[in-house]
Amino acid sequence: MSEKIHFTKMHGAGNDYIYVDTTLYNIKDPAAAAIAWSDRHKGIGSDGLVLIGRSPLPEADFTMRIFNADGSEAMMCGNASRCIGKYLYERTHPWPLPCKEGDGYQETVIRLLTLSGIKLLFLRIVNGIVESVTVDMGEPVFENERQFNPVIQPPSPRRGAEGEAGSLFVSMGNPHYVIFTNDVDAVETKGCELEFHAAFPERCNIEFAEMRPDGIRVRVWERGSGITQACGTGACATAVAACKTGRSGRKNRIIMDGGELEIEWNEADNHVYMTGPAEFVFEGEIEDPLPAPPLGGVWSAIKIKK
């Protein structure tokens, strides 16, 4: 008889994933599950699958693995990290980590092990509910031969009137190519082409960004998922690129299709800090058939609880 796996769907600024606690359930083929479950017509519908586990290392508390909607595994996801923070705190009783008391709120820190290293999640809690999560995304990298070949230049807008670059490669653990433009909707026609451009050996996430008085308007094409409502690492890469090219200061409001994120590129430690919301959508059970289905197989969701 097929095992039923409990899942929780969450989103951060519209970037939605399916979350499964691997301390309770074993998914035999995560890549196939991500493809099937992410289907918005025949599955649960999401940008991918996130697996939560206990860390095997004493330096971290929990682990995160992310599989995109096409089954490929991602190094890091800022929005998923925030959702994991909310999920863990509100679903773990009693809470095992120290909490700091503030004026009408509490704070706790989670050390999350990802494929791009350990990330710190700073949770702000009011009346037992996680109000917001700030993630230390680490330092940006501008040169990474494994992710970007500068000899093969991808298409880029002309330089601005004062000579600032029209685009910039930024790695936030995963690769991003940020293009400054007045037409962010061009992501719909150019995103896929750029993801697979020869300049990016491991493919690339693509951001089309427009500088506005109220912040930076960004639309994103995520590697392995296509157009998404938001991308945490993409928001960080865009803010860093805007600052690096002289378009903005170190604190930026990033306006994406699904919501807004606050990004700070801290001058003292060179780390990028991302703050934003995390929300539950629904939960339910889904069957994990034996053996694992072939890629593209569909697993039917049952007992959805709003």
Model-derived features with residue positions:
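Cationic, low-complexity basic patches in intrinsically disordered or flexible, solvent-exposed regions
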Residues: 154
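Intrinsically disordered, low-complexity segments enriched in serine/threonine/proline/glycine
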Residues: 100, 104, 165, 301-304
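Generic short N-terminal amphipathic or hydrophobic helices
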Residues: 109, 151, 301-303
